[in-house]
């Protein structure tokens, strides 16, 4: 069974299934996985920090508060925060004519994701971030592997992390 995660959303599962998200541009997709209990989760975050944007609306649309929700729901399924491994995708620079640091949301999303993972003691084991193209990712909850598809310079690239 495949669960599709939209922008500003997340999903968790135990032992089986695929959790996917499409269209990661400047957004980031963060997968977390507990190998021992085979609990996985995926967050598709739109913006870096809730406080920076007034904390309005859905907390899952922000990297910092969305990650907190993801971890809590994974713990309900038996995951241990000490065993979580993270993989990070997205954070593309979608608007090449923008050079203002404050408007480079993709770069900031990646920075905040790494900071929040480190703050929680979660090891980042793989990433594919930056660039100018979108990505689609699929987390296989039975193995923890993430399959990624992206378009770069007109070519479709697939990789497994």
Swiss-Prot record:
What does the UniProt record say this protein does? Probably deamidates glutamine residues to glutamate on methyl-accepting chemotaxis receptors (MCPs), playing an important role in chemotaxis.
Q: Known EC number(s)?
A: 3.5.1.44
**CDD domains annotated for this entry?**
CheD (cd16352)
Q: Which InterPro entries match?
A: CheD-like_sf, Chemorcpt_Glu_NH3ase_CheD, Cytotoxic_necrot_fac-like_cat
The question of whether Hydrolase is a record keyword is answered with yes
Which branch of life, at top level?
Answer: Archaea
Q: Which Pfam families match?
A: CheD (PF03975)
Question: In its UniProt entry, what is this protein called?
Answer: Probable chemoreceptor glutamine deamidase CheD
Mind listing the GO molecular function terms for this protein?
A: protein-glutamine glutaminase activity
Similarity comment: family membership: Belongs to the CheD family.
User: Entry's PANTHER family?
Assistant: CHEMORECEPTOR GLUTAMINE DEAMIDASE CHED-RELATED
Q: Which residues form a coiled coil?
A: none
Reaction(s) this enzyme catalyzes, per UniProt: L-glutaminyl-[protein] + H2O = L-glutamyl-[protein] + NH4(+)
| SUPFAM superfamilies linked | CNF1/YfiH-like putative cysteine hydrolases
Q: Which processes are annotated in GO (biological process)?
A: chemotaxis
Sorted alphabetically, the keyword list is: Chemotaxis, Hydrolase
């Amino acid at each position: 069974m495949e669960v599709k995660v939209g922008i500003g959303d997340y999903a968790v599962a135990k032992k089986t299934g695929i959790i996917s998200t499409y269209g990661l541009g400047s957004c980031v997709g963060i997968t977390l996985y507990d190998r021992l209990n085979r609990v996985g989760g995926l967050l598709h975050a739109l913006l870096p920090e809730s406080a920076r944007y007034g904390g309005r609306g859905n907390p899952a649309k922000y990297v910092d508060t969305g990650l907190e929700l993801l971890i809590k729901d994974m713990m309900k399924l038996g995951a241990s925060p000490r065993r979580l491994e993270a993989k990070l995708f997205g954070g593309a620079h979608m608007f090449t004519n923008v050079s203002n640091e404050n408007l480079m949301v993709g770069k900031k999303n990646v920075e905040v994701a790494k900071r929040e993972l480190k703050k929680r003691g979660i090891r980042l084991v793989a990433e594919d971030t930056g660039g100018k193209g979108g990505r689609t990712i699929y987390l296989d909850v039975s193995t923890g592997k993430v399959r990624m598809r992206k378009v770069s310079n007109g070519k479709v690239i697939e990789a497994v992390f």
